[in-house]
A protein has these predicted regions:
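Extracytoplasmic/periplasmic substrate-recognition and gating elements
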Residues: 25, 54-55, 151, 237, ...
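C-terminal capping/gating helix-and-loop segments adjacent to ligand/active sites or protein-protein/ligand interfaces
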Residues: 309, 349-357, 369-423
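Hinge/lid segment of periplasmic solute-binding proteins
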Residues: 90-140, 167-169, 195, 287-295
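Extracytoplasmic "Venus flytrap"/periplasmic binding protein-like
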Residues: 47, 51-117, 146-154, 254-256, ...
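Extracytoplasmic/periplasmic solute-binding protein
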Residues: 130-133, 139, 165-216
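Extracytoplasmic "Venus flytrap"
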Residues: 28-46, 388
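A structural signal for short loop-to-beta-strand junctions that line the ligand-binding cleft
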Residues: 86, 113-148, 169, 179-180, ...
């Protein structure tokens, strides 16, 4: 019997004993989840919690949906004072929680065979797994099929424009008065780097791109400089919205598919969390001509078929919590193939839980078909820049590559020097 299965069995026996003793009050645990403005994800989490409460009468859950930035702010203080929730939302790019000893390994509670093998390393340290990887994603380039065609650009059957072809798309969009690339960095530390770093991945290939993110390759490398120069040209042509610096992530979705509208939108595939909400709640209008193209192939690129795959929204257990049995049982109840299938069906997004694609029934089957096509025969690189960058390097990435460089406020040379100063290992 797997360790997680054994723990669940023992916990169940403990609950039975407590029940037979009578009069025992249920144990209430607290849970903080992200996604207050993403209905499908919110409904999925709520349903899993309610199912758990129905099955485990000795545990109840006080569930709160809180914006991610607020969770992080509150949790950073709460874990130190002993006031953190029993279970809370976390992403792998917040290593200080694990480094500080604030997270409990889930191995003793969860059957790890129910997690995708590629998702476990994101939460593994010293042989232990510390997070339940519910949300996974690839970085995609969404586009408005009608608008792109209207400005005179034909997307080939490969769904991948050349470097010159994407430059032409930007020029034609600007000439037609349509923003070529919807993007904003008003409330996130990463969107401004998506186009550049996906281009760098395709230019360098997985090995050298990994060296770049690990501080082993200079941003002054000629291939990196060439790619940065190309993206700087797109910026100078007017690729991004004039409101780039203040446009928030949710607003950039609306900007793309509602008002004023844009040709393309680089975004992780959790795009669907907002896009598939009702139009009145900020989602895509009915009949929106959504397409997915590959990021452009770089001239002389080592890996035009490369793509980023990553783990995002996960749930962790507070190591100093007093109700870890109930908290662990909750995560164990979530980690099933059926729940993974329901996530993909309801949210239209990848998951680190194992699932059965043959059982997925969705009103967004056309979207799934195109997403699967864009991810066929690709070479994945695991993790985004902020999964690798830490401390001063991460701060510099946010200041330079997320903000100043795509806003046209800094040169290629200066951006490379600042990144090397903060990130390049001696």
């Amino acid at each position: 019997m797997a360790r997680g299965t054994l723990s669940a069995a023992l916990f169940g026996a403990g609950l039975l004993a407590a029940g037979s003793a009578g009069a025992a009050e249920p144990t209430q645990i607290t849970m903080w989840s992200n996604w207050p403005d993403e209905p499908a994800k919110k409904e999925w989490v709520t349903a899993r919690v309610r199912a758990f409460e129905a099955a485990q009468k000795q545990c109840t859950v006080k569930l709160s949906f809180i914006p991610k930035a607020d969770i992080y702010t509150q949790a950073k203080s709460a874990v130190r004072t002993g006031q953190a929730p029993d279970v809370f939302y976390m992403e792998p790019d917040q290593p200080e929680f694990l480094a500080g000893g604030f997270l409990e390994p889930i191995d003793a509670y969860v059957d790890l065979s129910k997690l995708e093998d590629w998702a476990k390393p994101a939460w593994t340290q010293k042989g232990k797994v510390y997070g339940l990887p519910v949300e996974a994603y690839t970085v995609e380039l969404y586009y408005n099929k009608d608008k792109v065609k209207a400005v005179g650009v034909e997307v080939p059957a490969s769904a991948q424009l050349t470097q010159d072809g994407f430059r032409d798309l930007v020029r034609k969009g600007v000439a037609a008065g349509v923003t070529p690339v919807s993007q904003g960095v008003g409330d996130r530390p990463f969107p401004g780097g998506l186009l550049l770093f996906e281009s760098l991945l395709r230019k360098l290939g997985t090995a050298d791109y990994g060296r770049l993110l690990n501080g082993e390759l200079s941003f002054k490398d000629p291939r990196v400089a060439e790619t940065m120069t190309y993206v700087k040209e797109l910026v100078d042509l007017g690729a991004y919205p004039k409101s780039f610096a203040t446009l928030k992530l949710g607003e950039s979705h609306y900007y793309f598919y509602q008002n004023p509208g844009a040709l393309t939108f680089p975004d992780p595939s959790w795009f669907t969390g907002r896009a598939f909400a009702p139009a009145a709640s900020g989602g895509m209008p009915d009949g929106f001509p959504l397409g997915i193209m590959q990021f452009p192939a770089m001239d002389g690129g080592q890996c035009p078929t490369c793509k980023t795959l990553a783990v995002a929204g996960s749930f962790v257990i507070y190591a100093r919590g007093k109700n870890k049995d109930c908290a662990g049982a909750l995560l164990a109840s979530m980690a099933t193939v059926d729940n993974g299938t329901k996530w993909m069906e309801q949210v239209s997004l990848q998951t680190g839980l194992k699932s059965d694609p043959s059982k997925i029934k969705s009103s967004h089957e056309d979207y799934f078909r195109e997403l699967n096509a864009r991810n066929k025969d690709v070479t994945y690189f695991f993790g985004t820049p902020l999964l690798y960058y830490r401390a001063k390097c991460a701060e510099t990435y946010t200041q330079v590559m997320n903000n100043a460089f795509p806003a046209g406020l800094i040169s290629v040379k200066d951006a490379a020097e600042r990144m090397d100063a903060a990130c390049l290992k001696s």
